[in-house]
Amino acid sequence: MPLVTLGANIAQALKKNEVIPDATGSTYTLILTDPDAPSRTDKSYSEYLHHIVTGLKLKAINSGSADSDQFSAADVAASFATPIDFSSGHELVPYMGPGPPPKTGLHRYIYILFKETKPSLTKFDGDRPRFGTNKPGHGVRAFAAEHGLIPVAVNFYYAQNEHQ
C-alpha cells in the first residue's frame, strides 16, 4: 500500500487499495477542551482547557520488505492500535479530568489532534478558563490559529455530574 499525504489528489487506480496517511517527520499537538463550562447555557468559563501535549510524533508502521509496497494486516493493525508516541511529547498543560458542576447537564469533552506548522510550543502562561484570555467563548479555534495548528483528527465524549 502506498502512503498518502493528507489532502492529496489520488488517482482512481490507487483508490481501490487501502490508503494510509503519511505523517513522516511531522509533529502534533493534542488538546482536550470543554466548550460547555460551566454549562451549555452559561459560557462564562468556555472554553475550559483540560490538557495540552505538544511535539507528539506518530508511530511509523512497518513498510514491509524492501522490494515490496505491501503491508501485512498485523503491521497495519499494530500501527493504529497506538498511533501516537506520547513519549515524544511535552506536557504543556497537565491533564485535568472532567468535573462538571452539579445541575449543569452533559458536557462535551473534545480531543483534537493538530499538525504543527511551527516549532512546538514549550510554555503556556494562561489560565484554563477561556484558554488564558478574558474573552468568553475563546478557546481552541483561536489558540490553534494563533499557533499555526491544523486539525487532523477529533473525538469527544460526554460526561455529567452525578448530582443532577
PLM region descriptions:
Residues 1-164:
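N-terminus-centered regions that define maturation/targeting leaders and the start
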